[in-house]
């Protein structure tokens, strides 16, 4: 028998219980189950637009499945994890949790929903169909061995970079990021508060947050950046290009490749032996650029998307 509960705010005990479940899932799948945005919301105990839905084993009271929703700037993020020992119940548990999650979203005005799944199966497709979601974007995780081959580095135009200065560069970075990702559902529309939440993360290191300023004009202008990440608690040998972008007004100058190589060189110097990044499957230009640097596809992540109608519109 299973009991279900919904929390709009998580106590330290709730967070500890769910963290143990997430750790078990991560160990089984060798994959972090929640993205940074969802994880920060959980760790902070919830904020406006947060809900944590838990399925507990009646006999022991232990969480065996967890679903979380978090409101973003223009959409809702949703995720579902099931204890590896109870995955024979994925359809039953997932259907119950996801239906309650979408009910909450509907009651809070509805909107666009994104559910990201690593290695989507027929069960995920069935669960998505039950809550009227359909396949959307597909992300490729690509990896490359570090350090890069010398011929790759030699064939890349070197550009001057400097490390992000906390308390100084936030506004310039937000301007370029939001221009570059103006239509992106997750990376667009960042605020200083959201940036500061990432800066408070244990893995944040400004020395690996590389900025390229143009200095041959009257005022130094941020033209591109490469934000790298090494989560030493997860795997100190994998270095991620967390976010990379070129201001749209400076496209076509090869800055994307130059900043990618600069970021990978930094990660190698910090001890990473594998470089990793995510890219949309339909971004063929970026994929071609990364392939020339030696990247290959490691796995795919599928988004299930849909529009949840506000309950107010249904009455």
Task: Give the positions of each predicted feature.
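Phosphate-binding active sites in nucleotide-utilizing proteins
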Residues: 181-228
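Active-site acidic-Proline motif in GNAT/NAT acetyltransferases
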Residues: 83-86, 247-249, 253, 281-282
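Conserved beta-strand-loop-alpha-helix junction that forms the acyl-donor binding cleft
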Residues: 114-124, 248, 277-287, 304-309
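Conserved acetyl-CoA-binding loop-helix of GNAT-fold acetyltransferases
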Residues: 89-103, 243-246, 252-269, 287-292
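C-terminal "cap" of GNAT-fold acetyltransferases
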Residues: 140-160, 273-284, 294, 299-315
